[in-house]
Design a protein with these regions (language model features):
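N-terminal secretory signal peptides that target proteins for export/translocation
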Residues: 1-4
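Elongated, non-catalytic scaffold/linker segments and compositionally distinctive motifs
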Residues: 6-8, 37
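Bacterial N-terminal signal peptides
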Residues: 9-19
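Flexible, surface-exposed loop/linker segments and immediately adjacent secondary-structure boundaries
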Residues: 24-213
């Protein structure tokens, strides 16, 4: 089986035939599992709606609207959930199903997200990074939430371990620990979150019940 390899620095292969230029199709890296309200993706300047079973492509700019949610699963089993008014791009995806290890770089431009790790993390992780507006998050065997909350930006680990690299400080979070970043960009020391903050974080990426339920 051919490994799925997409890199941030990769250039498109161009084929020129009869004075026309054929550009390689974008590579599929996953598919949509669930959608609430309006969610779309932009690829090479073209916007398309994301629906259940829609393909997710390398370098798609996935965006959720007001009261929207998106849940997608990548080819290695990594699961990504977006809250409302969120934007995310997969900048690097290297995965070989025969050797379950590779590299994943996710850029969260805005909004709340939930990341549930897949096979790319392998035995040690360390090759999965999530870049947020205020910090870089190194992931190991992890379920992690991040997003704007309580007038700052929060990161909370539900399982596994992450390293949060902000301005002038790096913090390691283990299961049940979170951190907050405010205007100074310095992550606070790891600590359990208050119940109210935790509830708001979970609500930000939770799908609403369908009508009639």
């Amino acid at each position: 089986m051919v490994p799925a390899i997409c890199r941030f620095s990769a250039s498109l292969a161009l084929g020129i035939f009869s004075a026309s230029v054929a550009v390689a199709e974008p590579m599929t890296v996953g598919a949509v599992d669930k959608v609430q309200a309006h969610v779309d993706a932009t690829q090479a300047g073209q916007v398309r709606p994301l629906l259940i079973n829609s393909d997710v492509y390398f370098r798609d700019r996935c965006h959720s609207g007001e009261d929207a949610r998106l849940q997608a699963t990548l080819k290695d089993g990594t699961q990504l959930t977006l809250g409302e008014n969120a934007t995310l791009v997969i900048d690097e995806f290297v995965y070989d199903p025969i050797r379950p290890r590779g590299k994943l770089l996710i850029r969260v431009i805005k909004g709340a997200f939930l990341y549930v790790g897949g096979l790319i993390e392998g035995e040690t992780g360390a090759k999965v990074w999530i870049q947020t507006p205020v910090a870089a998050i190194g992931v190991r065997g992890t379920t992690v939430w991040g997003g704007p909350i309580d007038n700052g930006y929060g990161v909370i680990v539900l399982s596994g371990e992450v390293t949060v690299i902000g301005k002038k400080r790096t913090v390691t979070l283990k299961q049940g620990q979170g951190t907050m970043l405010f205007k100074d960009g310095k992550p606070q020391r790891a600590a359990a979150w208050p119940a109210g903050r935790m509830k708001r974080a979970v609500a930000s990426i939770t799908f609403g019940k369908p009508p009639g339920q």
